[in-house]
Amino acid sequence: DNPRSRDERPLPKVFLRTLLFATSKRGCVVESMHVALSRNETQQNFNIWVYGDERLVRGSGLFVGETGIAVNHHFLTPQDGSSFRFTEGRYRMDVFAQLLGDRDRTLLFSQTLEISREIAAQLAEPDYGLYFDWGPDSSRYLPHVDKRPPLPNAAFLELLNLARRSQSRSRARVKR
């Protein structure tokens, strides 16, 4: 996730791509979703829900039909949860949905994930992210860390844009 300002670290984020489906012919509407992440006695809710593939939409309701919908889900911590950091340990991730018309939330699934000391040290550095991919032979999610490439400098991008405009004008003059 990008920081909200240049001086801030990015907020912790949980990203999932999942297929949701309804067992009824009429389908259902997901009013909201959130992730509850717990380690030992610490629990953090990731209650800011954003979803979509091409265009992200802040959790505003999602129709789920009988054939299902596969979509990317991003869960962020609220501003008051910004002190949360991923550290070494065993985590339980619970994904909940609030369905239209239901009084109680529904637990969609729960997964245990492990973060080693080495991975936790890497995550303390800026621009690193942790990914879990399914290992079919081990029947568990396996972690790996990746560093996000740096964002281009805004001034450099503006110069590049000016150079492209200049080249376009030169080509237009030559074609006359």
Residue spans for each PLM region:
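Extended low-complexity, serine/threonine- and proline-enriched intrinsically disordered segments
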Residues: 31-49, 94-97
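Terminal connector regions
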Residues: 79-131
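Acidic, serine/threonine- and proline-rich intrinsically disordered appendage/tail regions
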Residues: 111-176
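Extended, solvent-exposed segments with strong compositional bias
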Residues: 46-88, 96-105
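Contiguous beta-strand segments within globular domains
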Residues: 4-35, 65-77, 140, 146-157
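Beta-strand elements of well-folded, non-transmembrane domains
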Residues: 20-24, 37-41, 77, 97-101, ...
